Amino acid sequence: MRRPIIAGNWKMHKTPSEAVKLVEELIPLVKDAKAEVVVIPPFVDLTEVARVIKGTNILLGAQNMFWEEKGAYTGEISPVMLKEIGVTYVVIGHSERRQYFKETDEMVNKKVLSALSHDLKPIVCVGESLSQREEGKTYDVVLTQTREALKGVSEEDITKVVIAYEPVWAIGTGKNATPQDANEVIKAIRNTIAELYGKDKAEMVRIQYGGSVKPDNISGFMAESDIDGALVGGASLVAEDFAKIVNY
């Protein structure tokens, strides 16, 4: 059985002091969670959040990383830095990174391979835009992104990768895919992983849904056979709301 994973991507929200307050409120609310719980604050909050969640069931994630260990890459953060402060997961290829910072499938793949080589678990985001959806290209776009992201990932490492299906048109818009629609796309992602790594490995890979996930719609998504959790945005900024999602 795949253990569900609920991750809260805070995006560019919460100063270090606000971050501490949020996780302190969250800890008692999720202590009995059956799902794996991950918080993903901005870089400047990571050290403080790591300190507060130490010894709890909450794991730490980062929102991005560069693929080199060190060097003249102004403004970037390396996997070595993340590992040292206690990061377990790293989000790679979020649609906002692809859109605003022009991340390509090739860059996403470099980051995935680098994360795995430094014992970080990638949460790889894939998803189609509204125009791509309307043109009937959902599967083409999402499965291509999946294949490109996983190039060179070993059979041994594939089960450490989490995929997050985030339809771009559903992020922060209040619109969301129906649980059935999301499940169909996620099933296709799993079938693609099976083509690359075999059915047994594909059955072990966790695939999340992301895109306007809230306390009142989480149970519908989690009832679907192939959805293994959620990558939560705005609702993860309020402890009570995120806890309701975690404890669906």
UniProtKB/Swiss-Prot annotation:
InterPro entries: Aldolase_TIM (IPR013785), TIM_sf (IPR035990), TrioseP_Isoase_bac/euk (IPR022896), Triosephosphate_isomerase (IPR000652), Triosephosphate_isomerase_AS (IPR020861). It comes from the Bacteria. The keyword Metal-binding does not apply. The active site is at H94, E166. The keyword Cytoplasm applies. One of its GO terms (molecular function) is triose-phosphate isomerase activity. Its main location: cytoplasm. Its EC number is 5.3.1.1. Pfam families: TIM. It is an enzyme of class 5 (isomerase). Belongs to the triosephosphate isomerase family. This is Triosephosphate isomerase. It comes from Caldanaerobacter subterraneus subsp. tengcongensis (strain DSM 15242 / JCM 11007 / NBRC 100824 / MB4) (Thermoanaerobacter tengcongensis).
